[in-house]
Amino acid sequence: MRRLFTSESVTEGHPDKVADQISDAILDAMLEQDPKSRVAVETLVTTGLVIVAGEVTTRAYVEIPDIVRKTILEIGYTRAKYGFDGETCGVLTSIHSQSPDIALGVDKALEVKSGEEVADELEALGAGDQGIMFGYATNETPEYMPLPITLAHRLAMRLAEVRKKGILPFLRPDGKTQVTIEYEDDKPVRVDTVLISTQHDPDISQADLREAIIEHVINPVIPEEYRDDKMKILVNPTGRFVLGGPMADTGLTGRKIIVDTYGGWVPHGGGAFSGKDPTKVDRSAHYMARYVAKNVVAAGLADKFLIQLSYAIGVAKPVSILIDTFGTAKVDEEKLLKVITEIFDFRPGAIIKKLNLLRPIYRKTAAYGHFGRNEEEFTWEKLDMVDELKRAFNM
């Protein structure tokens, strides 16, 4: 059976991603000074203005306006004619302390209050909120990610690269990409459509822009094995994209959760990542779920693997764990679930220790996806549990 599936990505200059990066830059600054910082920071960006609000408990002192401006300038909003730039934008902050009622459950989990012994203060942590989280992996790409979101991210990254390196100096920071893949019997066979919308200077013609984007962005990214003469290419289909960024669209933290994860291929629990320290299971448990899924697929136990975790606020252990291999399991699924629960520890404190999450690593995650990347900071992408999983099945 043939079918089409589409995923999108956005550049670091997209308003929602500007907000995500500001929130995570603030988080990083606090974790750098105080790894025990509790942070939940939301950002709004609009014409000439940034608003930062949230709840923070920390010993750190950070100049939030300085972080905001530095982040905006690094993204590329450096000129007032863009309608938004790091030098002149206003910055309003409204930060207060975390609710002590929440802290009661996070500092000491229900299990600890009930007499369960733990190794240290970190393992005593309860979940920072209730919620459901999904992790996924597939062997259809070397990154163990679905191909549509993988290519969409690569195109978005390439848009930023050619802009920043001056290869296409007429590009501006805002942009979006979208890739439609044709599947046959659950295998990707060709790229059906590539869509790129990119902000640009007013004096570049649509024809010249299209030619440049095809030559310098699409051709270097889309693999030959997935191309044919039927592949459709759309570049700025409205015909003009001069007004962009926060001047054209208000941006908010947490509005690109599908871009951040698997491009819509699997369900999403709804919780965003950026601006949240790792005691928030919205972030840390999603990372752990991806870690488990990637190692399971890399171990050859399934071609596709989905795991769902759920938590209750103030409770360390998950309320539930579900797995789904979509009929691709190479081993007994009941045993697979049992093995996973035995060799992976899903308590928030254990996740934080295993993945080394109390570090200022989050700004980099806030654009181009949290998964399928090989940088050192992305510890949840490591394949260091493959051998242990194989041993459990005598493989």
Curated annotation (Swiss-Prot):
Chain residue ranges for the region called Flexible loop: 98-108
Residues annotated for K(+) binding in this entry: 42
Keywords assigned by UniProt, alphabetized: ATP-binding, Cytoplasm, Magnesium, Metal-binding, Nucleotide-binding, One-carbon metabolism, Potassium, Transferase
Its EC number(s): 2.5.1.6
Residues at which ATP binds: 14, 174-176, 240-241, 249, 255-256, 272, 276
Predominant subcellular localization, coarse grouping: cytoplasm
Pathway: Amino-acid biosynthesis; S-adenosyl-L-methionine biosynthesis; S-adenosyl-L-methionine from L-methionine: step 1/1
Localization per record: Cytoplasm
Catalytic activity as recorded in UniProt: L-methionine + ATP + H2O = S-adenosyl-L-methionine + phosphate + diphosphate
Cross-referenced SUPFAM superfamilies: S-adenosylmethionine synthetase
One Gene Ontology CC term in the entry: cytoplasm
Annotated residues for binding of Mg(2+): 16
Any GO molecular function: ATP binding
GO biological process: one-carbon metabolic process; S-adenosylmethionine biosynthetic process
Pfam families given in the database record: S-AdoMet_synt_C, S-AdoMet_synt_M, S-AdoMet_synt_N
Protein biosynthesis is among the record's keywords: no
Residues involved in L-methionine binding: 55, 98, 249, 280
CC cofactor note: Binds 2 divalent ions per subunit.
Cofactor: Mg(2+); K(+)
Function: Catalyzes the formation of S-adenosylmethionine (AdoMet) from methionine and ATP. The overall synthetic reaction is composed of two sequential steps, AdoMet formation and the subsequent tripolyphosphate hydrolysis which occurs prior to release of AdoMet from the enzyme.
Family statement: Belongs to the AdoMet synthase family.
Subunit structure: Homotetramer; dimer of dimers.
Protein's recorded name: S-adenosylmethionine synthase
UniProt lineage: Bacteria, Thermotogati, Thermotogota, Thermotogae, Thermotogales
